A protein has these predicted regions:
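Asp-based phosphoryl-transfer active-site loop
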Residues: 1-14, 211
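C-terminal cap/substrate-recognition subdomain and adjoining C-terminal extension
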Residues: 76-281
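Short, charged low-complexity intrinsically disordered segments located at boundaries
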Residues: 11-12, 16, 47-55, 71, ...
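A metal-dependent, Asp-based hydrolase signature
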Residues: 14-16, 20-96, 100
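Short, solvent-exposed loop/turn and secondary-structure capping segments
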Residues: 11-14, 19-22, 129-130, 213
Length: 281
């Protein structure tokens, strides 16, 4: 079981992929007319005056801007952003920012008969195009946060009182159902996977519940791993956060993975961090 941002994929340059997608929708999409609140939030984060934390307001804003989009249009929007250059690196697009050493771990597990799941706080419909562009996983093994889906003709009618018609289409409803972090990761794993993982990989406090659940009363040998953001030269690391997580690993029996000390490369040949830039960890 793998977390995504900061575990398999670049987490903050200067912030999360899903929020940068929000900025693109609000500031760069001529087909969209943002509200004053959305515009202020997007401008503040793009200028780095105020990058939001993982709050309910952040989640609400991110979902509202896509309300009414078809699933096909939204996937195309995500894929378009994936093709844009990565702001803080040379030689890499937004959708290519996977940690190569972690992809090697995934490949090794798949080659030895393991089922590999991704369990992330990123919205499921954002997560799938990115993950499936690189990993040979079935889409149902890519688990993220969930938001409402509606039939175009449904309006405000409750789903129990509405029948989907042959001529209808699905659109994004713009409201959160569950943010897949902390204890919510455990609940989602029980509902969607149905068996306890034997390996769990994370990188932050929002993954602790997933690791504890994996290690608790497991009938099989189980291990938990935390990726440390301790590389300040090749990545946008944070020494303080990395050291805090290293200490937590020692106290909880998790295995630390050091970007700085354990990885010969992060993104591969030809990819370099731009001089004079600073990430958002």
């Amino acid at each position: 079981m793998f977390d995504f941002d900061g575990t398999l994929f670049c987490e903050t340059d200067p912030t999360y992929f899903d929020w940068l997608l929000f900025e693109r929708r609000v500031l760069d999409d001529p087909s969209y007319r943002p509200t004053a609140e959305q515009l202020a939030a997007a401008k503040a984060s793009r200028s780095r005056a105020a990058i939001p934390g993982l709050t309910n307001d952040r989640e609400r804003l991110m979902l509202e801007v896509y309300e009414g989009m078809t699933l096909e249009a939204f996937e195309a929007f995500v894929r378009g952003f994936m093709q844009e250059p990565h702001a803080g690196f040379t030689g890499m697009k937004r959708g290519e920012a996977f940690y190569l050493p972690m992809l090697e771990v995934v490949d090794l597990l798949l080659a030895n008969g393991f089922s590999v799941y991704v369990c992330s706080g990123t919205d499921r419909l954002v997560l799938r195009p990115v993950v499936l562009s690189k990993l040979p996983l079935p889409p149902q093994w890519v688990i993220g946060s969930d938001s409402t889906l509606l039939a175009r003709a449904q309006g405000t009618c409750d789903g129990l009182a509405f029948t989907y018609r042959k001529e209808d289409e699905l659109v994004l409803g713009g409201k959160s159902i569950v943010k897949n972090l902390q204890m919510n990761k455990v609940s989602v794993l029980v509902r969607e996977v149905g068996i306890r993982p034997v390996l769990a990989f994370g990188n932050s406090s929002s993954d602790i519940s997933m690791l504890n659940y994996t290690l608790q009363k497991n009938p099989h040998r189980a291990m938990g791993f935390m990726v440390l953001c301790d590389d300040l030269a090749r990545e946008y690391g944070n020494a303080g956060k990395a050291e805090k997580m290293r200490s937590a690993c020692g106290k909880n029996g998790w295995i630390p993975i050091s970007m700085r000390d354990d990885w010969k490369t992060i993104y591969g040949d030809g990819v370099e961090r731009k001089a004079g830039t600073a990430g958002g960890r």
